[in-house]
Amino acid sequence: MHCPAKINYFFRWANYVKGVIANFHNIGPLEVGFDAAIVTSVPLGGGVSSSAALEVAFYTLLESLSNSLASDKKQKALACQKAEHDFAGNPCGIMDQFVSIFGDKGHAVFIDCMKMEAESVPLDDPNCAVLITNSNVKHDLATSAYAER
């Protein structure tokens, strides 16, 4: 892959965007320039897939700018995962990107990583509640044993 973008270690979040741009160019040309401001309410580093949310949102912006909205969702997830591997140095799995792309309101996402398939599962049982909490436990896949698997 040839990309003139340099990895930035001070503004680490920018590396995710650079990686998405680099991987999008592998799929189709982006023939317009643009300015973008990134604003989020997703807590960074809180274990709620903020990096995948950023990657998928930015990829979706590029699809819109290039009029290539018919992108394959699995290919989109893999491109975003590759961005995280190559530009952020984070050897992540595919779960976060799949959930960001295949998720639907009121549904869980069942992911078969062997087949690289996702399925929406309704969460319509009134006796079931989903609780999301911030444990304040920080993890860093780039420096953990995760990459050895």
What are these regions (language model features)?
Residues M1-A52, V56-K73, L78-F87, C92, ...:
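ATP-binding N-lobe of GHMP and related small-molecule kinases
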Residues N67-R149:
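ATP-dependent small-molecule kinase catalytic core of the GHMP/sugar-kinase superfamily
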